[in-house]
Regions:
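Bacterial N-terminal signal peptides that target proteins for export
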Residues: 1-9
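C-terminal motif of bacterial Sec signal peptides marking the signal peptidase cleavage site
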Residues: 16-19
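Bacterial signal peptide processing site
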Residues: 21-24
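Short amphipathic, basic-aromatic surface patches that mediate peripheral association
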Residues: 35-45
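Short coil-to-beta strand junction motifs in C2/discoidin
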Residues: 46-55
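Tryptophan-paired
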Residues: 68-105
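A short, solvent-exposed beta-strand micro-motif common in secreted/extracellular proteins
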Residues: 109-119
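Glycine-rich, aromatic-bearing surface loops/beta-hairpins
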Residues: 128-154
Length: 154
């Protein structure tokens, strides 16, 4: 008995691609943000930790987000980002409490921007931006410690 390897390979490839299509029809693609504020996050004038507002932006491009100052982004996001802004939402986080935030991205979204409204904004690392795939299933960890915010890898 002779095996038809090219035919077998093609059939396997079609089954694999069909499986991906089925997975997307069963569960919508999403991006999961795991926001991990430390216990000492956003200290007040007496060095006590405080709640923090996080604003998440869905962006078509990242240049205007990277170039803007904090107060323009926070107070006037539509005017500041213009057509780069696809959507945004706010999340209030508490020190030491981990948040899981799941997002179904708009098809125009290419980047996710994250802004943290720290009390001491002058000394804070308050902005992150990273690539996003509106058709994929991504998990992103954001660690927040005192006055800094950074992406973490597993």
């Amino acid at each position: 008995m002779r095996c038809n390897w090219p035919g077998f390979f093609l059939l396997s490839l079609l089954a694999l691609l069909g499986g991906c299509a089925i997975a997307n029809s069963v569960a919508d693609p999403e991006t999961a943000l795991r926001i991990e504020p430390a216990i000492n996050v956003n200290p007040d004038i007496k060095d006590r930790p405080s709640p923090l507002t996080i604003r998440i932006f869905e962006l078509e491009a990242r240049h205007s987000f990277r170039a803007a100052d904090f107060f323009k982004l926070y107070d006037e996001p539509e005017q500041t980002l213009g057509s780069d802004l696809v959507a945004s939402e706010d999340i209030a986080v508490r020190p030491g409490r981990v948040y899981e935030h799941r997002m179904s991205l708009n098809k125009e979204t290419r980047y996710i921007g994250v802004l943290a409204a720290f009390r001491d904004i002058q000394n804070a690392q308050w902005r992150l931006v990273f690539e996003a795939d509106p058709r994929g299933y991504d998990e992103v960890r954001i660690a927040i410690d005192r006055l800094t915010m950074k992406l973490e890898s597993d």
